[in-house]
């Protein structure tokens, strides 16, 4: 691309290959890729997990944001309620996979998730999270639940 115009160096391939990362993790819920809505794919994935899981749980919870759609599907498939046991506070925190050091990533993961203690204590919770980049958010959330709340089964 120059000020004089655009030149195509190579034609695109006939067959597209799209990254599934868009549906599971990075895609915005209203986006569609190859005719499939992101939120629908997440919900359906969770639904199938719930239908096939024999764990005994009191409720399903999603780790915001991309885990929520899957957790809603899981809850429906399993026949258990969905509880918003973790709220996300993001005005000052980036995505937890973005900082350069693991120490910073752990700090971001810990600070941006706020638990609702009354929905967690003494419950058998099933959390759904994508955690496909580094697993930092899920690891920090589970560690927090065990260390600070103590009476949750995760």
Question: Could you tell me what each predicted segment is?
Answer:
Residues 1-151:
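PRPP-associated nucleotide enzymes
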